[in-house]
Amino acid sequence: MGSNKFDKNDRFFFSPAVGASWIISNESFMKEVKAVNFLKLKASFGVLGYTGNTGFFLYQTGWNNNGNYNFFQDQTDHKVSLARWGNPDLTWEYSQEFNIGIEGLFFNNRLSTELNYFHECRKDIIGVNNAQYAATAGNYTMYENIGQVTNQGIDIAINWKGNIGRDFLYTVGANMTYSKNKLDKWNEIEGVESYRKAIGRPTSTIFGLQALGLFGKDIPLEDHSLQSYGIYQNGDIAYADLNNNGIVDDNDRMSQGQSFPVTTWGINVD
């Protein structure tokens, strides 16, 4: 694989893959099992590079044109400012993918089933490592290979083909996918409170403030930590000051669940 999104030393990526299968139904010990028409065990492993989320020329330092300025009355020159530091060591995101499964046909090919287990480790995900630099650094940051995500799960499909009379044919089936992922590495600040950590949680984790109740009804207004989100009064929601610093702000956000469903189901009728 090749891409001009990287420096000349990293423009090519070796992407090997291998797969194997065993058709169990072809074995002699299966010949007498009339209910099984086809049965196959399969497995594969591959390494795949990604450039879809990578911008062009991130390996080069970029500059902005800020117009002109005059000096010595009649002399003009251009003004430029730093837009982004380039990173010549930036390289491909890639995934290591492993799959193993079994598929079969039964009862004169009327019943078809398939079960697969998948495991993917996505490495060297590209992002801005702003946790390494102070906020006052401005644009003096660069894109780096800083992330890693693990995805794994199973998917199952089952279908039945039948007929009513000679002319009415039908197929009914169901499928299910169970999938979980976890952020293994990212540019997270060292020493951050455990409730704020993104590492170790699903990538679709939603962070938000923890509601304690209503001011005036559940929580005394005058005894609560200062909430930094505008004016509030009795009847408004009181939020938890999780780090106990006397101020409720973004540093008190905690995991509220995730937006991506772990299990999905489907039914088909033809």
Residue ranges of model-derived segments:
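Outer-membrane beta-barrel signature, preferentially recognizing the C-terminal barrel domain
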Residues: N68-S112, T141-G165, G200-I206, Q258-T263
